[in-house]
Structures are given as C-alpha cells and as structure tokens.
Amino acid sequence: MRLLQKECGKCLRHPFLWIVCITFGLFQFLSIYTYVGNAGMRKELRQMHVAVTDEETASPEYESAYADYKKTYGGMYDTLDMRKILEQKEKKSGYEPQGAWGMWIVRNYDRLQKRVEQIRKTGEGTYAFYPGSWYKLHSTLYGKLWKKLILQTAVLMILSMLYLMDYERIYKTQDLVLATTTGKKMMEKKMLAGALCGLFYAGLLTVFTLLVFFAAVPFQNLWHVPVAACMVAEPRLQMMYPFVTFWRLEQWRYLLLALVVLVGLLGIIAAVTAAVQLFLQNSYFSFAVLGLLFMGAYLLGYVQMGNVWDLIREFFNPTVLYATSGGWFMENDLCLSFAGNEFAVLFCSGTAAVCLMAVGKRRYHRLEV
C-alpha cells in the first residue's frame, strides 16, 4: 500500500499531466460554449425550459412554438414501424446481411417493434422535453462531447500509465529493478497506480464537462423524462424517429450507464497500454503503437462482410463504442441493435485485453539485465 501511494504521488505531482488535463478541460469548455453556451442560446434554452416545464408562466411565443412542435412530432410512435426503419437503413448503408445472419438482425428489429408497442401502451413517448430537432441536446452531450471525452480521458489514462511504467528507464534505474524478482513485481503496483491516476484525471475532466454542460442547459424537472420520448427524438440518417431504447431509461439513468461504459472503456485502454508497454519497454514507442493500434481498430469497424463475422469483429473492438457514442442502449447500429450489446463489447474486448496483458507480464518477468 505504501508503494502504491508513493507511485500515485509521483503521477499526481507531474505538471505535464495536469497541463494536459487542464488543456482538455478548456477545450471542452469552448466546445460547450460553441454548442449551447453562448448568451443567446442560454437565454433561448431558459425560455424553452419554462415552456416545457411550466406552461402557465411561459412566454406566449415559446409556448406556441413548443405546442406546434409537439403537434408535429408528438405522435411519432403511432406509425413507427421498425421493419421499415431496418429496410431504409439497409438501403442507405448498402449493407445487406444474408442467410441466418440477416434473419437474426430481422428478429432483433421485431423485438424492437415489441418495445415500440410497449412504449405506446405505457405512454413513455409522451413526456415533455426540449424539441430534439431544434437543440439536439442528446447528440450534443452523448455524441459530440462524449466522443471528445472518450479520446481525452483515453490519452490521460495512457500518459499516466506510461509515465509510471517507464519511470525507471527514463531515470536510468531500470537495471536495478530487473535484477531482482521483488523489483520486477513493483511493475504490478505501477500499473495499478497508473490506472488509478488515469481514472482520477479522467474523473476530473468528466465532472468538469458535465458541470459546465448542465450549467448551460437547465435540466430541472427533466431528469425523469425517458430518452425514448418523442420530444427527445433527433434526425438520424436523414430520418426522424425516436430513440427506441431497449429498456425504459430516464435521463439520469442514461447518464449513469454512459459513465459506466466510459469507465469500462478506460479499463480496457489501461490493460492494452500495460500490455504494449510490457512488450516494448519504451513509453515513446508504446504511445505511437497505441495510437496506430486504436486508429486501425476504428477503421476496421467500417469493414463489412455481411455475415456473423461482423458481430464477432465488433465484440472484440472497443472503438465500436466510440463510433456509436450517442446511440448506446438503443436501436442504432444494425449489427448491435440488441439489448446489452455495449456490455458484450466491453466483456469480450476486456477479456482479450486482460489476456494480452497477462502475456506481457509473463514476458516481463523473464527479462534479465
């Protein structure tokens, strides 16, 4: 425990990591200001918030505009057919799954149609919220900002781990560490300390991002609104239809689940970083290899074969969750439109990363001076 505290202290005292974290925070602040934070947008959001939550005190102009929008889009579930959504998506994307794989995707969309019928019966789609196609708050937070957050926190995690794991080589004491079994076991503490510090920096950046966003966008009395509500819906792939979530997910539940996925992704990144550094023993080379590795994995996600290998490839590719950010826990990607797909990706990718790290540790313990 004492060694762990000492290693964490090294990382938390390093000025470069704080500079990177603060720089990312400023970048998020500017992004939020651009999307929803300028004075005109904040004023409009406050006025619309009153129109959504308290019609009696709302401005007539905003109340009328909101009523017209609700009249236009408030009944989308009445005619929503998930089979037609599937057909349109296949046509637009050019993706045509065949055989048993194609039937499996069709069955997933049939289950989504049952979910649509459930939403109709329970009235889940009738809740009031900011007009989705006007403000695009869901895609702004969980798409644009969350994707930036994933990249930024990933960099912070990688830098934290590489700094501690390569500390001895940088300061010319690696020979002393590799000379004994006890010295080699120190690397496990360094890996854990690096992961904890990476989570600390990531937590600071995430909290800052959320505080700034929700300071700009009033959410009082809206946390209970389901993400599947018609008013939350936004245009996607030149189509306008609701976010059909696999379960009833209010705004606060969706935020918590998004945070869980973010932590899971950071855990995978930590394991992969440890594995690469254990193999290469050089933080500069490791950082370059990690960048190429994740970039390659991201591009691989766009390779389509039209069979079950597409699903297997996505299960073992954590960058898929980056690509689909904003569409988690709902109908989105054709291959992943089934409940729990996010956790399946985290489990499979995490298992592969841990196995790779175990191989790296085995190799590291065989190193000699």
For every predicted segment, state its role.
Residues 7-10, 272-279, 348-369:
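Junction motif at the cytosolic side of a transmembrane helix
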Residues 23, 27-58, 92-93, 101-106, ...:
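Secretory targeting signals
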Residues 34, 280-315:
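Transmembrane helix segments
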Residues 1-20, 24, 189-191:
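Aromatic- and glycine-rich beta-strand/loop motifs that create alpha-glucan
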Residues 177-184:
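Short helix-to-coil transition segments within interhelical loops
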Residues 11-15, 195, 199, 283:
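Loop-to-transmembrane-helix entry motif
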